[in-house]
Amino acid sequence: MSIWEKAYSREESTFQNKDGGKIYYQVYRPKSGAKKVMVVHHGFGEHSGRYTNLLDAIADKGYVVYLIDARGHGRSDGRRGVITDFADFFADLKQLIDIAKQKEGVQKITLLGHSMGAAVVFLYTGKDNNQNDLNALITSALPIKVQTDLVMDIKKAAGGFLAKLLPTLTIPAGLDVNMISHDKSVVEAYVNDPLVHGNISAYLGDFLLNCYDDALETAAKIKVPIYMFHGKEDQIAISTGSIDAFERLGSSDKTLKLFDGLYHESMNETPREREIVFKELVAWIDKH
């Protein structure tokens, strides 16, 4: 039995979003008792079931962990990879945060997002009064900068055209699965996971390829404690994006960790490497 299986009781549930769709989420409640709440948003094409390494790492930290399957992902409703307004992710996330606060009897939560999920939680935090719900913000592999080669330049130009003309048209995201982790078992599991998909709508692809300026503008508005981390060899979301956003943060309590040699999913790297990643994350969590 794994660490997380011993440490938590697990619940599954759904809620209806503003558009009538069913949004799936999981709750992991520590058997030793809960002190705090963490809400986790996954990356593009994946789902909430891929975060057991995180659950292991914080098993003794007293967090009830809520993990969402974003619309169009995992077990939630919606065409795979299709969204026509990024703010729909914000609305669904807000609903889950409100559910977590109400169920756990807390006023504030810690919010963590990876990759596309990092973009969701980062941009969400800078909107309206959303920071009032947060103790802290954590981002993994914030995807506001991508490789700038000729193929990507063409995709960016075509994506903008298609996003306006055919926003729900799905195209292959072109993700090189070998670049998610050095751990071959992680890559193999990703490829064989029936809940993982590789298609992205023209609108969503265009948004993620062109959200750099929005993210930098948002950074100045973020005042809550924030921990950002990124693999320096990430070829999917370039680590300089996290650096640029970090430098513009309005928060006086901010930390950025860059990990030499690591790929996109640093929390799913080889056991030795991810141990280092989680040691730094847990050390920061312990202070917040």
Predicted regions, residues:
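Catalytic nucleophile-loop/oxyanion-hole region of alpha/beta-hydrolase
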Residues: G45-S48, G74-K108, P271-I276
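Conserved alpha/beta-hydrolase
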Residues: S48-R50, L55-R79
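Alpha/beta-hydrolase-fold enzymes
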Residues: M116-S201
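Short beta-strand/loop motif that positions the catalytic acidic residue
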Residues: I222, M228-H230, D234
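Short alpha-helix in the alpha/beta-hydrolase fold that links the catalytic acid
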Residues: V224, I238-E247
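Catalytic active-site module of serine/aspartate enzymes centered on a nucleophile-bearing elbow/loop
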Residues: T255-H288
